[in-house]
């Protein structure tokens, strides 16, 4: 490393330096697990909420639109607010969206919640990955960084469906929303310790 060991100044001194980037990578995976509506439980959602398949897919498209529309603002937010503020607001947004999404039956409101969840999801992921970019590649080599980023994103998509299916098999499809809300509480706990 060019200037000594990699350190993230937003962590307190008791957190070991070697653990700091791994914690941020873990938080990025947690943000990518979130979705508001989980397609692994598509058929159960259709049956229990009396919705059509296209309605649920529109929720996913709203989530993607939230990420795409908010993306140009990410750098402005990064330079305007602190790391703690951005991660805390993103985690709170994902937490609230996951808690209320299973109970909404009015479709435009559900689409809006999924849209907001997508904005929070991209904010949290971007904040984590941009902070550990120099740990992954000290020379800012994007041929190293983007494969890592794609592993996090695509791996989390697969893992999200696996977890959703497992929780749905043993419990109920809404337990994935509760699971992600619990993970967001862990993110908030990390931010405040």
Which residues make up each language-model segment?
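Cytoplasmic helix-loop-helix junction between adjacent transmembrane helices
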Residues: 115-151
């Amino acid at each position: 490393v060019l200037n000594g060991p990699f350190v993230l100044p937003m962590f307190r001194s008791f957190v070991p330096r070697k653990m700091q980037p791994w914690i941020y990578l873990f938080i990025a995976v947690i943000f990518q697990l979130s979705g508001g509506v989980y397609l692994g439980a598509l058929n159960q959602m259709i049956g229990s909420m009396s919705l059509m398949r296209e309605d649920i897919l529109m929720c996913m498209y709203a989530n993607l639109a939230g990420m795409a529309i908010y993306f140009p603002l990410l750098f402005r937010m990064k330079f305007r607010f602190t790391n703690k503020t951005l991660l805390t607001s993103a985690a709170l947004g994902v937490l609230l969206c996951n808690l209320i999404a299973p109970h909404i039956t009015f479709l435009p409101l559900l689409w809006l919640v999924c849209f907001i969840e997508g904005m929070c999801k991209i904010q949290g992921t971007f904040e984590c990955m941009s902070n550990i970019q120099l740990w992954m590649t000290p020379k800012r080599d994007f041929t190293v960084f983007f494969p890592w980023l794609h592993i996090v994103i695509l791996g989390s998509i697969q893992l999200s469906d696996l977890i959703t299916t497992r929780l749905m098999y043993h419990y109920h499809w809404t337990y994935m929303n509760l699971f992600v809300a619990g993970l967001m509480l862990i993110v908030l706990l990390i931010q405040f310790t």
